[in-house]
């Protein structure tokens, strides 16, 4: 093609205008501006011209290149707009359809269980209390009638920070601090994190506990039994749920008991969860030991009381049928959304 014929871009303009889609337009661009395009080959021939003609021809070719690029851009914009319009025509929105709700967060299952427990005991006149998670030896052990040679003090159970400070192993520490600042009669519960050196499918180094304490002039084990039986019936929404109290030992209560419920998984017939016994341990409780009352300055002749403690994760696992405690702490949204 001669340089004079390149002075006219009518042919390129016709091709661009006739392009009906983006693929065709791209082929036209390559034909005129590609590595082997008409304008590219013409520019490669500039070296064959005389210096006077070369300057004029080069200027002309650059002008034509700019004009063709402009035509291509305009046509591309037109074709893209037409494609969007056609797609919108095919994908008409039905404004009568319900909209999509925004993703919302929800309370963690452990938090839901804690709130249920707190609400239940608030309705019975209990107040809530809290205490430090970094405790001293006195409040975590000595004040709870746990002697120095008790197994609970062993390093395999407790996280010690130094010789006198540790991460609390139970929320019973709050019971002692509450007694130091309150006089009976009283009712309190304490919820919070506790720490023990253990980790498997049913234990984690950190877990949540609820501690309860009631002191009054005529508090009895019968009151304790009625309170916790009603609590378990309500928590599992099973008024006929079997509940039994087994004699046990805790240094800070006497007498002491552990509470079992009929297995909520198999209905008491025996399964892997209840180890074929038909029963599941869920609570520890007992009458407050006289030594604990005396250490807190409470008149044990006038006042008696009971205490109880429960692991929140275990109750939550049984309530929702979760078989691995660690799922509560892995923050997998697929798991957590089931409780929203």
From Swiss-Prot:
NCBIfam families: pheS (TIGR00468). Gene3D superfamilies: Bira Bifunctional Protein, Domain 2 (3.30.930.10). GO terms for molecular function: ATP binding; magnesium ion binding; phenylalanine-tRNA ligase activity; tRNA binding. Transmembrane segments: none annotated. Keywords: Aminoacyl-tRNA synthetase, ATP-binding, Cytoplasm, Ligase, Magnesium, Metal-binding, Nucleotide-binding, Protein biosynthesis. HAMAP family: Phe_tRNA_synth_alpha1 (MF_00281). Its EC number is 6.1.1.20. Its main location: cytoplasm. It comes from Acidithiobacillus ferrooxidans (strain ATCC 23270 / DSM 14882 / CIP 104768 / NCIMB 8455) (Ferrobacillus ferrooxidans (strain ATCC 23270)). GO terms for cellular component: cytoplasm. It catalyses: tRNA(Phe) + L-phenylalanine + ATP = L-phenylalanyl-tRNA(Phe) + AMP + diphosphate + H(+). PANTHER family: PHENYLALANINE--TRNA LIGASE, MITOCHONDRIAL, PHENYLALANYL-TRNA SYNTHETASE. It is found in: Cytoplasm. Coiled coil: none annotated. This is Phenylalanine--tRNA ligase alpha subunit.
